[in-house]
């Protein structure tokens, strides 16, 4: 699917952008552009590490590892050490014993970051990636917190015009 040069380039870019070794990236990937989802992912991940399940560690940007069974004070100290702000698109990896965990990448602002990170993640052949927390507006029937599945993209930013003609809907 990808030649060796492209794979090597993308793996190195993943480390550069996310602050994590590419080997930590899990096959189920969430992308977000809101830090509050990072906070919730960390909180949820820490709770998962306290339960009996397949999750074994949470890896933060800078390859900081929080392991199953670690007490709350130790985990909080490690979270505080994370230099996530040094990376353009910091990634957080909730790992399992069989490599079927979840990675969350905070892509920040802009479709160019989304394109960049997905281009580089593609060489890992993930099972799925999904953008969460990105909604341009609500209908009268919706409330804050409702699940929204985006199915369209307004082409007013001109980012993809050279690749996909503007008359083609995305």
Q: Where do the language-model regions lie?
A:
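Glycine-rich phosphate- or other oxyanion-binding loops that anchor nucleotides, phosphorylated ligands
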Residues: 28, 69-170
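N-terminal short beta-loop-beta anion/metal-coordinating cradle
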Residues: 1-106
